[in-house]
Each structure stands twice: as structure tokens, then as C-alpha cells.
Swiss-Prot record:
Keywords: DNA-binding, Nucleus, Transcription, Transcription regulation. May interact with the K-box of MADS1 and MADS6. The gene is MADS15. This is MADS-box transcription factor 15. It comes from Oryza sativa subsp. japonica (Rice). GO terms for cellular component: nucleus. It comes from the Eukaryota. SMART domains: MADS. Probable transcription factor.
Amino acid sequence: MGRGKVQLKRIENKINRQVTFSKRRNGLLKKAHEISVLCDAEVAAIVFSPKGKLYEYATDSRMDKILERYERYSYAEKALISAESESEGNWCHEYRKLKAKIETIQKCHKHLMGEDLESLNLKELQQLEQQLESSLKHIISRKSHLMLESISELQKKERSLQEENKALQKELVERQKNVRGQQQVGQWDQTQVQAQAQAQPQAQTSSSSSSMLRDQQALLPPQNICYPPVMMGERNDAAAAAAVAAQGQVQLRIGGLPPWMLSHLNA
């Protein structure tokens, strides 16, 4: 027959109780070590003897860390449960606080706008005045700072525009010099062309005039011919004969001239 179920109860005999404690304690610590090694679990076992003596086991002797982890998980779970139970009551309290804060802010805003001042006493009005003066000083200071920054930025732009203007003026002067030089060169070329155009007709006129003068001189009788001395009667006859001969020579020469020269001579 099999063994019956053993009833667990306190051992009355002190000696037997001490022996059983020693056996079961060693078995418990051994089992804790086995489960820690086999299952890679963090195990902590704390045992106090009937006389108050401490026996313990901890994985890798890290009892403090295991207990700290236990407390963190235990208290976190308790805090979550308590927070859920208290949150419902806290919502109403938070709502009342936020509502009162909103009302206070709205009231201060009205006071700053100059509204609902009847409920304020002299001291509160003085505090409000000081607050407004302080705010006004901050506003003026901020405004002045922004204006100075704007002026500085405008001055920088002005200097940049002045430098750009100087560069453009310099470029314009250079271009004007180039244009004037080109105009002077063009005028000089035009003057040379006009001078050459005027010189050609004058040369043609002078050449034609000189040729006509040479022709006219060729037609005139020679003045340096020496005639022998003759008597009075003979002189008249000789002069008449010479005139007739010269006229004949002139007519012969004129007959050999071109028509345009004949018209010039007749004129």
C-alpha cells in the first residue's frame, strides 16, 4: 500500500523541530541554487531560524540588486493600482484648480485693459500701476533695440549702395572716355576723307590751268627773236610781213587744238 498523505503541522519537540529545520533549509537553498543555474533565473531566498538566525541565498551573491528590483516592481504595481483608484477623485480637484486659475488670469487681463477696476483698493491699484509701468519700460526697451537694429541694417545697406554707386560712376566715366575717343577718331578720319576729296578737284584744276597756260604761251610769238636793222620803209614792210607770218602760225596752231580749248580761247 502507498504512503498516505502526511499532515503538515508544527513539530512540538524542539530537538526534532531543529533537525527538520536544518534538513529542509539545506534542501531549500540547494533547490534555489539549482533553479538559478539550470534556468538562468535570478533567485533570492531568505530564511530565519526559530532562534532568529539568518540564512540566505542569492544568484551571484547579488541580494541587494534582487531586492531592489523586487521593491521597484512591487511598489510600481501598488502605485499603479492606487493611482487608478485615486485618479477619479483627483480629476475633480484638478478641474477646480484649473478653473480658478483661468478665472484669475481673465480677471488680471481685464485689470490690465482698464476694466473692472471698481473691485480694487488703493494698494491693488498702485501695484497694477507699477506693473504697467514695468511692462511699458520693457516694451520701450524692446522697441528701441529693434529700432537700433533696423538703423544699423539700413546703414549697412546705404554703405553698400554708395559703394555700388561709386563703381557704376567709375564705369560710366570709363565708357564716356571710350566713346569720346571713338568720336575723335571718327572725326579725324572724316576730316582726312574731306581733305582728300577737296584736294583732288584742286589738283585737277591746277593741272588743267597749267596745261592751258602752256598752250597759250606756245601760241604767242617769241619775244626774244632778233631782227636785223632796217630802214624806215623797210621796217614797216618787215613788221607787216612778220605780223602776217605770226598770224598764220597762230591759225595753224589753233587748227590743231581741240574744240574745248578753242571755245576757251574765243571767250
